[in-house]
Structure formats: structure tokens, C-alpha cells
Amino acid sequence: MADSLKMGNLSLNESQHAPAPAPSTGRAAYIPPHLRGRQMGGNMDGAAAAAPPPGPAAGPGNSWGGPRGGPRGGQWANANAPDFSPRGPNGNTSWSPHEARRPFNPNAYGHPGHGGSYGSGGGSARGSGDGQWRDGKHIPGPANPRLERELFGLPNDPTKQNTGINFANYDDIPVEASGHDVPEPVNAFTNPPLDDHLIENIKLAHYQTPTPVQKYSIPIVMNGRDLMACAQTGSGKTGGFLFPILSQAYQNGPSAAPAQAGGQFGYGRQRKAYPTSLILAPTRELVSQIFDEARKFAYRSWVRPCVVYGGADIGSQLRQIERGCDLLVATPGRLVDLIERGRISLVNIKYLILDEADRMLDMGFEPQIRRIVEGEDMPHVNDRQTLMFSATFPRDIQMLARDFLKDYVFLSVGRVGSTSENITQKVEYVEDHDKRSVLLDILHTHGTSGLTLIFVETKRMADSLSDFLLNQRFPATAIHGDRTQRERERALEMFRSGRCPILVATAVAARGLDIPNVTHVINYDLPTDIDDYVHRIGRTGRAGNTGIATAFFNRGNRGVVRDLIDLLKEAHQEVPSFLESIAREGSGYGGRGGRGGRGRGANATRDMRRMGGGMGGPPSFGGSSYGAPGGSYGGGGGGSSSYGAPPSYGGGGGYGGGGSYGGGYGNPSGPTGPSSWW
């Protein structure tokens, strides 16, 4: 009886691993276990079912005809086979498909090999949907309700950011746009200038009105101009560059990839990707966040966004790129790695975006950025559009713009480098040994109804403080640079969802992260850089919502007291009397002015082309040491350096100097002391 028993299409008296008998027309092809119910229609009565007919049976995105679109873009592809034939889950290359291979369609989603998308046979899904570029037109794919819920959430979804009660006040923020022939701003998401498909996705994201930075950046980019934009943190900078570049992609279609010599695996599949848009950002969390936003607005389009960053499996990132890459979001280090491996070419880049450019330079990425922009195959500055976005643009970053941008528009929305008036700032005098008890008082007072973000300076303190809070029955988790990428992503997800409403973080999470519904930011340890303080508290009060920021201050933080007072006054916040007192008694300390002294000078957010020193020539490093008293960058006196203005808070100024807190990297012994490591 067992000899005649068949389960589905698998016969017990026929070994699938034994030598095959002579071909028989009565035997059906092997069907994987998870497909048997669908293919057999639940036929378990012993009758062998007919094999499925050859030809495209399962719809787009299916590399071997399984359900639900199959393993998208060739997930089971066998890289060792010359034709990229599929293989089984155990790596057995003898597993043959149960349908005839479909011919490569050169018209599927934008010509073979375009943008690193490799015609894997039948219009595989691109981007967050399966739109196509065909006959010079953008054809959006069908709606996908499950993916829509994942990307855009349900109405009133607490994990998705909505505009707050003060969002309309953004219209009162002053805007400075400098440059010649600046395009007029737009006041709504309309066509023109935006593409209709992008407008549909913007509506799905529940965006009603463009923010000030978007009102100006959309027409500027759509008119082909380079842009350097500064705006309040949380004011929509990501949309400011994604909206125009995606809209133009939908209107203009893909660019053909250059012919490759022996670089194809077959059937149009290429080894090297040719993205048309490149977005560089400093941290893993920020590039992941930008990628998530790009997926939203590329939904149902032909554009396929990809993300690459260090600290994650490079193999999975390579497979993602091989399935198609039109818009690439990357950290500089990992991008250089992939360029060296020959897996990404920048020759097709139309749009280069540098997000949080000042932080990338602070983190030491300038050599990699210059290599990417100037040392590889990226088009010349005159043959691409370059956009720089950040919440602060000090003078040295504006000098970098001289090399990367052409005839750019400088856009300053609000007083950049300042804080939002939507944030209520409180400064408490707390000695180090009292911080834990004061923190518990604050948490008991405010409760855990909203999300609370606590910033500390060291990784050890992040772990120690989160353990302490857990022992005090507060649901807390920590995120810092020593945690693995998976641990960091899990901690952020638990925080975003509200399952763990207290997050203790180092500076790794301070800038750029858009975490909805953070109602309270606590600076347990104040940073030494006032710009870091601005970006930390900018995690609350986003998109017009209100928030609270509390800072623990003591005499160990007197290096930032002057900048902190200016910041509080600027945002119309209460200035505690102890801050004024410490500022008066500590006049010898001065303000450090940020990392290496490049922080909040009086002109740190102005277009340097309009200042007296102009943009002419690199800074003068001769004449004295880096910290010559009075000179901006050691140019030898008051206004003689090429930046044309002394630092705001002297004490050595610039990159160092003789004052006690004169600068981060100068000669602590002063200009007459022994030479420093510079």
C-alpha cells in the first residue's frame, strides 16, 4: 500500500535523489513543499496533478513562478551558474524550475541594465512598487494595501509623525534666499512643478502643506540650480530634496547605463549598479531613515531606492543593489568600499545630496567625501546638481560648498543654528552626584505618557543609566556606537513603538533621527559643542509639535555658558540667574564655539559670498599658529584671514589659542609655547 501512496506530487517509491529513470511524460516536475497546496489545489487523493504550463504564470517580480511575487529580484539566484539559474534553499544547483524560463523583456522598467536594474525576466518590482518606464512614459504599478500600511501607517498611527498644532506658524519664519535669479517659492504640492504620482504619495503620507524649506527648495531644484539649504531641525529637509529629485525622475525617466566589457552575468543582469541619485549622510540611523522616506515617495514607481552603511552584512546589501538601484542612500565609508569592489559606478549621477554635511566633516569623513565627489567617476560639478542640507552651516562648510557647488542658491529658513520656539527649554543646576535622583524626580513628574530621550556623553554611562532606570522600574533601553546594528535597530523600534518609552543615547542618535512623538529630551550630560545641544533638543518639537527640553548644568559645563545664554534668549526662553552669574565670573573661559572653534560665529548661517571676506581663496594658514589671538584661522590679526571676521567669542578663537578654553585643537601653551601636534 505504501508503494502506491503519493503525497501531493511526491511519490514515496520515487526517490528525488536517485538517478533519474528514462524520461516519462507522465511524471510531474518537482514542486517545493510550500507550493504544493496551491499548485495541486489540495489534491491529496493519489492522483498526480499536471505540471503547470510553461510561460509567465505568477506575475511580476517572480524569478521562478512562486506565489506572492516569489523571491523578489532573484533571491534564490545561483551566482555560480553562468545563467543565474535558481537553486534550492540548501544550495543544491540541480533544482530545476517548474516552468520554462521567460525571455528577458528589454522594455521592463526602463531598458536593460539601467541604473543597476538588471532585467531579471518579466518586469521585476522596482522601488516600493512595481511601476515601469515604458515608451517614454511612467506607468505606476498597482496599489498594494499591505505595503501601504507598512509605509504610511493607518490614520492616527502613533508611530507616524503628524503635523502639530504650531505647524502653521512656520509661515511666519523669515526666509533668506541669496543668489541670482532665485525662483519664486511654491505654496502647495501641485502640478506643476511636481509630478502627479509624487503628489499622490505625498497625500498618502498625510502631508498637507510644504514647509518653508520645501517651498523654496522644490522650485530651486526643479529649475536645475544647486542649493545650500539651512533650516530648523525637524522642518522637512528630507522632503526638501526627495520631492524634486523623485518628481524629475518620474517625468524624465531612467538614464541608460554605459556598456560594460564582460560585466554581465547574462539575461541583462549586471554586476555594477549605476544610480542616478546619491544621498550621503553621516550615520547608519540617518541613512536608514532617509531610505524609509524614499521608499514612501517611490511607492508604485519605477524608481528603486537602496541603502548601504557600515556595520551591517555587506552581502545582503550587494544583493539589494544587484536587484536594482536608482536612488542610493549611503554612508561615505561603505560607499567607498563598494566603489573599490567595482559594484557601484557614479558615472550616471545626476543629483548629489549631502545631508548633515557639517556632522560628516566633524566625524572625519572629509577625505572620503572628497574622494567620492572628486576622485571617482562622478560627473563634474557642471554636469550634475549638488544639494547640501543641514541645520547648521558654519563658515568652513560654506567654503567646502565652493568646491562642490556651482552658482548655488543659499537658503536660510529661520535663524539656522537656533532652536525651535516649539520647544520649552529648562536648565537646571545639578551636580554630577545628584543627577540620578533629579532624573527620577523628572520622570515621576512627567510620567511615561510620551517618549523621553536622555542624552549622555559616554557609552558606559548609557548602559549604566539604562540599567539604573530598569532597576527603578522605568522601561528604558540604550543606544550607542558599541551596540551591534541589530541591537540599535531593535532599541529604536521599541522606542518608536512606545513599548520602551525611555531611550538613553549617546551622540550617535543625536542628529538627523526623526523619531515621532518625542515629548521630552533630557541632556543628562551637556555636550561641549552648542551645535550638538541644538540638534539633541531638536529631536522633540518636530513638524510643529511641542516638546520639553531639560538640561542638567553645573560648573563643568561653563565652556558653553555664553552660547547657551544666547540660544535661550534667541528662542525667547527663560534664562536662569545662575547662568548669568557663571557667565560673568567665568569671562576668562569664553565660548569654545563648537568643535575646533568653528561653531556659532555671528555669521555662521549667512551666505559668505555676501560677507566682507567673500569666498575668495582658501583660508590663510600662514603668519601665525592655528590659534593666533584675534585671527579667525590664524591669518594674523583681526580681519586679515580670508574669512574676514574674528571669532565671536575670543579667548584664542579659531582652532585653538592661548585661552583656557580657547579651542579644541590648538596649542594649549599659547602661540609662544611648544608646537602642538598640528
UniProtKB/Swiss-Prot annotation:
| Any one biological process term the GO annotation gives | positive regulation of formation of translation preinitiation complex
What protein name is recorded for this chain? Answer: ATP-dependent RNA helicase ded1
**Which stretches does UniProt call biased (Low complexity)?**
668-678
Q: What is its EC number?
A: 3.6.4.13
By its UniProt entry, which Pfam families does this protein fall under?
Answer: DEAD, Helicase_C
CDD domains on file: DEADc_DDX3_DDX4, SF2_C_DEAD
Query: Which residue intervals define the domain Helicase ATP-binding in the entry?
Result: 218-411
List the InterPro entries: DEAD/DEAH_box_helicase_dom (IPR011545), Ded1/Dbp1_DEADc (IPR044763), Helicase_ATP-bd (IPR014001), Helicase_C-like (IPR001650), P-loop_NTPase (IPR027417), RNA-helicase_DEAD-box_CS (IPR000629), RNA_helicase_DEAD_Q_motif (IPR014014)
Reaction(s) catalyzed by this protein? ATP + H2O = ADP + phosphate + H(+)
Record keywords, A-Z: ATP-binding, Cytoplasm, Helicase, Hydrolase, Initiation factor, Nucleotide-binding, Protein biosynthesis, RNA-binding
Q: Where is this motif: DEAD box?
A: 355-358
> What's the stated role of this polypeptide?
ATP-binding RNA helicase involved in translation initiation. Remodels RNA in response to ADP and ATP concentrations by facilitating disruption, but also formation of RNA duplexes.
Chain span(s) of sequence motif Q motif: 187-215
Q: Which residues bind ATP?
A: 231-238
Q: Which organism is it from?
A: Aspergillus niger (strain ATCC MYA-4892 / CBS 513.88 / FGSC A1513)
Where is this protein chiefly located? cytoplasm
In what residue span(s) does the Helicase C-terminal domain sit? 422-583
Entry note about domains? The Q motif is unique to and characteristic of the DEAD box family of RNA helicases and controls ATP binding and hydrolysis.
| Domain of life assignment | Eukaryota
Protein family (similarity comment): Belongs to the DEAD box helicase family. DDX3/DED1 subfamily.
